[in-house]
Amino acid sequence: MRLSALEMIEKTTSESYFQAQLAARAFSDEIAAPTNAKTLTKALSYLNRRELRRVRRAYQFAEEAHDGQRRLSGHPYVTHPLAVAGVLADMHMDHQSIMAALLHDVLEDSGIDKEVLVESFGEEVADIVDGVSKLATIYKTSAEEHAENFQKMAMATTQDLRVILVKLADRLHNMRTIGALDRDKRRRIARETLDFYAPIANRLGMNAIKIELEELGFETVYPLRAGLIGRAVSAARGNRKALMEEIRKSILAVLKREGIDATVVGREKHLYSIYTKMKAQRKSFGD
């Protein structure tokens, strides 16, 4: 169906608005560089002193390896591995995972050999970093295959689960800053994220990361649809939120009367989940 001139203008305006939002987010310090050495150290308060010293050495190595390199947002490149490490610190991952996050791009982007990492940080950390680099190769050789095949291959060829966790954190920060890329590259990476990385996060039970990857991917690939559903959800939220709270309290009262100590929470479906359900059932939002 051909669009009218007015519809074309509205479509272009809406897409421009969403692309501007993506770019603004990507270039902001809060998103592009959310973590620095000081805040990372604070987030790693669960580690002991020896482990923190090793993490600090990994950071210094990464800072030197990426010296002079910059992200497309203009931020020093080291802000990216710091952000990836910050995601894993929030998950209370072990110090080897944090070190690998800080070092995850030095093999590909800085011309450093794996043997150097082995000598500097041990074989365990070097293997994680090497595994993260190899995951990208697995994707490139499996791009034409079904998404599920890639997921199975990634899981099967990765002996250490921490490799996948570092890669997911890497993809999450890249998706948060995807607005710095040109439109075609944005859409390709966002499509990869929806097809491959979000399902892997789901397989691992990492629901919060899965949802964020899906939302970021959805609004990048389908900005107009994301906007329409987002506005519809906002318009309906008031009444539905009150109804959900009423139902929650009723269930809680019944449980209490039966002597069952429980916590009842309500959960709103996120935009991509609503979209996939509408698409599968061929229904509109109102249905």
Regions of interest found by a model, annotated:
Residues 1-287:
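Active-site helical microenvironments for divalent-metal-assisted chemistry
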